[in-house]
Curated annotation (Swiss-Prot):
This is Ligninase LG6. Residues 352-361 have a biased composition (Low complexity). It is an enzyme of class 1 (oxidoreductase). Its EC number is 1.11.1.14. Binds 1 heme b (iron(II)-protoporphyrin IX) group per subunit. Its cofactor is heme b; Ca(2+). The active site is at H75 (proton acceptor). GO terms for molecular function: diarylpropane peroxidase activity; heme binding; metal ion binding. Ca(2+) 2 binds at S205, D222, T224, V227, D229.
Length: 372
């Protein structure tokens, strides 16, 4: 989805909003809990919200279950290929919930290894509340992200029909893929460009690896995995010095901090001339991080769908807490300085950041979901 398409889409959305403002206001409904929503059908999702916040996300925490729910959104949605369709083959349904409906097939695909745990955790909620898997994946991902301080106001639309067949294998990027391969894949999936690829990877701000290193799970990608901030974009540009576990694993390269995982793909995209400046642009720029991820998350959750036929239930999604104010938006972890930065953007210098005081930062493991 090129930036000119984004600009056109925003302009169209604003014109529609202006033209239909009065009608939307009249359509708003009040739910039994007193909340006001844009469409009465959204009210049913408050029961789902209360249930998953307590029983899936452990009291609205930005923990392992939230991280894996966000990951599941991408792995379900990106499995769509117009290129395959043009060859007369089934190209996948995008954000249709096929990874849950056909989990015996899709969770065995190599890039989806480990997702069977969150799929099994989500299934009972889908059955209990009678919603479609595609809608639930998008909802759980939006709620999960809202549990992470600093996250944007997440959007959520309903209307996804159940998937009719499993997505083909080979459509989810792997951490050992080249930058060319990954850019090509996301461009095929949704006409996303290299800048929008970087926006997608903002999700790694609140993420961890459970299966890249088979000897250790819950390895975070940055030192603040419970906060949606730009530390991921800072720390991926620091010189790698060691592996957090066994090392030598496919798709892993050295990281700068003890206990931190660095994916080969993240390292490569952070240093590629096509993406390095966009990567660096998020450092110390929380507002850009928030707005770009808000857009790309919605775009991902509508892959394979007709947005005009969907219902906006974003009113149900909680508003995230702000980033804690006891530390800067971006900083060098204790023990790191500008000398550790591997400058990749040729257009602008790396921002000047404060180094946190104290002994060298060591990143704590995130407890994986039950059964992992």
């Amino acid at each position: 989805m090129a930036l000119k398409q984004l600009a056109a889409a925003v302009a169209l959305a604003l014109s529609i909003q202006a033209a239909q403002g009065a009608a939307v206001k009249e359509k708003r409904a009040t739910c039994s809990n007193g909340a006001t929503v844009g469409d009465a059908s959204s009210c049913a999702w408050f029961d789902v919200l209360d249930d998953i916040q307590q029983n899936l996300f452990n009291g609205a925490q930005c923990g392992a279950e939230a991280h894996e729910s966000i990951r599941l959104v991408f792995h379900d949605a990106i499995a769509i290929s117009p290129a395959l369709e043009s060859q007369g083959k089934f190209g996948g349904g995008g954000a249709d919930g096929s990874i849950i409906l056909f989990d015996d097939i899709e969770t065995n695909f190599h890039p989806n290894i480990g997702l069977d745990e969150i799929v099994n955790l989500q299934k009972p909620f889908i059955q209990k509340h009678g919603v479609t898997p595609g809608d639930f994946i998008a909802f759980a991902g939006a709620v999960a992200m809202s549990n992470c301080p600093g996250a944007p106001q997440m959007n959520f639309f309903t209307g996804r029909a159940p998937a009719t067949q499993a997505a083909p294998d080979g459509l989810v990027p792997e951490p050992f893929h080249t930058v060319d391969q990954i850019i090509s894949r996301v461009n095929d999936a949704g006409e996303f460009d290299e800048l929008e690829l970087v926006w997608m990877l903002s999700a790694h701000s609140v993420a961890a690896a459970n299966d890249v290193d088979p000897t250790i799970q819950g390895l975070a990608f940055d030192s603040t995995p419970g906060v949606f901030d730009s530390q991921f974009f800072v720390e991926t540009q620091l010189r790698g010095t060691a592996f957090p576990g066994s090392g030598g694993n496919q798709g892993e390269v050295e990281s700068p901090l003890p206990g931190e995982m660095r994916l080969q793909s993240d390292s490569s995209i952070a240093r590629d001339s096509r993406t390095a400046c966009e990567w660096q642009s998020f450092v110390n720029n929380q507002s850009k991080l928030v707005s770009d991820f808000q857009f790309i998350f919605l775009a991902l959750t509508q892959l394979g769908e007709n947005p005009d036929a969907m219902t906006d239930c974003s009113d149900v999604i909680p508003i995230s807490k702000p980033v804690p104010n006891n530390v800067p938006f971006s900083f060098f972890p204790a023990g790191k300085t500008m000398a550790d930065v591997e400058q990749a953007c040729a257009e602008t210098p790396f921002p000047t950041l404060t180094t946190l005081p104290g002994p060298e930062t060591s990143v704590q493991r995130i407890q994986p979901p039950p059964g992992a």
